[in-house]
From Swiss-Prot:
PROSITE patterns the record matches: DHHC (PS50216)
Organism whose genome encodes this protein: Danio rerio
Family according to the record: Belongs to the DHHC palmitoyltransferase family.
EC number: 2.3.1.225, 2.3.1.-
Lineage of the species this protein comes from: Eukaryota, Metazoa, Chordata, Craniata, Vertebrata
Catalytic activity: L-cysteinyl-[protein] + hexadecanoyl-CoA = S-hexadecanoyl-L-cysteinyl-[protein] + CoA; L-cysteinyl-[protein] + tetradecanoyl-CoA = S-tetradecanoyl-L-cysteinyl-[protein] + CoA; L-cysteinyl-[protein] + octadecanoyl-CoA = S-octadecanoyl-L-cysteinyl-[protein] + CoA
Name this polypeptide is given: Palmitoyltransferase ZDHHC2
Length: 361
């Protein structure tokens, strides 16, 4: 027999699919209400009916496709170079002194493109996955793994939204909003006619009226959520980074990864315009290292700690992290001049001083 702990875990995994099932049932009912009750049973004009059905099915297809991709795209995990080797794990286990353990981790980290730190200035280490976290990577407690460029864990897709599927998530929000707006707009006149008793009471009345209320309500909530994530894309921030700015060697910098709105957009949607509206992976980079452009200190951000050289904080000439050769897709983002609005900026040094390293879950 399976252990009781395993059965309990499996039960919880099943419960995680309830929000997805709820969304699926709502969408399935909306399809029946719109196609059958509105278009087939209520609308009499053949031209109007045909146009509505064509546009509706196009939006429905793109919505389902992007939702599927968001749910079933496996989150990307850090490359093996960031994991501790078997030998390094044994060395850490044998060492009792913290300084000795830090030396081991320091040796591993010095050749990796890791430039973000914990709030205390230590290199970010996950003691559950036994790895040094790449920039923008976080450990998801729900998935129990480290996720590259983690944005958030979304219960409505039962998946982590991160580097592997953030574009799909954005398209899911966009097509969901368009779907709801289209249903609301085309259903409105028949909703009004049923409301004012302009049409006879039939089985379609309930479906058409409730469809209008549901679609309009979802439109409002989706509009706010989509607008927020559009803002995040333009700023090149994740939801986690919006709540807590990433920390670099010089301190926290909420604009540390921003390259300008257009380049930030390309990081998520890619260089190929033909793929921008399709839920096909086209994001730039590998999810482990990101180009960055440091900007002037934000007065709302904490000041540079005493004892640190203020010149380490760049006034912002475009400079990619890491100083090692970047992937071709990352290099393209940094071509053609500086980030918008950068003037008279000092160049940041490429030194990588040893820092205190601590574990971070």
């Amino acid at each position: 027999m399976a252990p009781s702990g395993s059965r309990s875990f499996d039960c919880w995994r099943v419960l995680y699919w309830i929000p997805v099932l709820f969304i699926s049932l709502i969408v399935a009912w909306s399809y029946y209400a719109y196609v059958v009750q509105l278009c087939i049973e209520t609308i009499e004009n053949m031209g109007e009916k045909t146009v509505y059905l064509l546009i509706y099915h196009l939006l429905f297809l793109m919505f389902v496709w992007s939702y599927w991709q968001t749910i079933y795209s496996k989150p990307m995990n850090p490359l093996k170079e960031f994991h501790l080797s078997h030998v390094d794990k044994e060395l850490l286990e044998r060492e009792d002194r913290r300084e000795s353990q830090q030396e081991i981790l320091r040796r591993i980290a010095k050749d990796l493109p890791i430039y973000t730190r914990t709030m205390s200035g230590a290199i970010r280490y996950c003691d559950r996955c036994l790895l040094l976290k790449p920039d923008r990577c976080h450990h998801c407690s729900a998935c129990d793994m480290c996720i590259l460029k983690m944005d958030h864990h979304c219960p409505w897709v039962n998946n982590c939204v991160g580097f592997a599927n953030y574009k799909f998530f954005m398209l899911f929000l966009a097509y969901s909003l368009l779907y709801c707006l289209f249903v609301t707009a085309t259903d409105m006149q028949y909703f009004i006619q049923f409301w004012t008793n302009g049409l006879p009471d039939t089985q379609a009345k309930f479906h058409i009226m409730f469809l209008f209320f549901a679609a309009s309500t979802f439109s409002v909530s989706l509009a706010f959520l989509f607008a927020y994530h559009c803002w995040l894309v333009c700023k090149n921030r994740s939801t986690l980074e919006a709540f807590r700015a990433p920390a670099f060697q010089h301190g926290t910098d909420k604009n540390g990864f921003s390259l300008g709105a257009y380049k930030n957009f390309r990081q998520v949607f890619g260089d190929e315009k033909k793929y921008w509206l399709l839920p096909i992976f086209s994001s730039l980079g590998d999810g482990c290292s990101f180009p960055t452009c440091l900007v002037n200190p934000d007065p709302e951000q904490p000041s540079i700690p005493p004892g640190r050289n203020p010149s380490v904080k760049s006034a912002g000439e475009s400079h990619p992290f890491p100083p090692k050769p970047l992937r071709e897709s990352q290099s393209r983002l940094l071509n053609n001049g500086q980030t918008d609005g950068s003037e008279d900026r000092d160049k940041r040094g490429t030194s990588n001083p040893a820092l205190t390293i601590e574990k971070e879950t």
